[in-house]
Amino acid sequence: MNKSFTLSALLVLFAAPAMADDLSKYQEESRTVATAFVTQLIGENKKAVMEGGPESAIKVCKEIAPKMAGDVSRKQGWKLTRVSLKVRNPLLGSADAWEQKVLMDFEKRIAKGEKPESMEFVEIVKEPAGNSFRYMKAIALQPGCVTCHGAAEQIPDAVKARLADEYPNDKATGYAPGQIRGAISIKRTL
């Protein structure tokens, strides 16, 4: 038997459990970071609404959330973003090809009855620059979020005016509570 083939086969055999352990570890770390990010974002939105009304939440999503994502990315050494198929800010929220595929898969899973609160996806992706661990956690629209992301009749006039001013090409409306608004996406180079 070819010695190099045997050595390669043994390396794969022994490396597979280690890779699975790493994948589970990365998934748990990513889940923890994504959950903390969403919890903090919801808290910031609630605080803004209490202090300045519903249109104040727009500033949270436009200015505070990207800063929070940048802070997490720098601290962890990963890239954390919020992505969607229906973006409000195409510069920050547009999904790449892999993220689009996962978001469409989330939609299929929700159609089959899976709860969005626990929906996530992980994969090791081979890219030109090397392998990356990719993680996504679905963001389900919360009841209070319809004020900015709901059907046209659910959005107050002051919020509509502010959205039209801030986001003239806004596509992030028409959602109902429980639908997937987007996802937290984490990418880390391996």
Name the predicted role of every residue range:
Residues V146-E153:
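Detector for the c-type heme attachment site
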Residues S8-A15:
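Bacterial N-terminal signal peptides
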Residues D21-Q142, Q154-L190:
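Extracytoplasmic c-type cytochrome modules immediately beyond a signal peptide or single-pass transmembrane anchor
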Residues M1-L7:
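Bacterial N-terminal signal peptides that target proteins for export
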Residues A16-A20:
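Sec/Tat signal peptide C-region and signal peptidase I cleavage site
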